[in-house]
Amino acid sequence: MILVIGHAMAKPETLHAMLAISVEHVLRSRTEPGCISHEVSADVQQPLRLSFVERWSDLAALKAHFRVEASRAFAKALAGMADGMPQNSVYQSEEIDLAAGRG
């Protein structure tokens, strides 16, 4: 599984617009092949910080997501409104079943 963790800092005057385009992006992305989950949330300690967490079935699905014109337009629009550059980190991961070791 591929895990994407990112964040973007809003300015007070851009927070509402950044949230709106982020929710639209999340809802669209969830319909793409290979998307397991895609979420955006506001940090409770830093309300201007938007956090993104995405889970993709494989790297090919994530690369296809990055090639979607709407994804590219979202990234450009978000960067244009953000206070600084949005950050993204991509990881290859596997889920660990913590209950499997009990017994």
Regions found by a protein language model. Name each.
Residues M1-I2, A17-L19, W56-D58:
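N-proximal accessory regions
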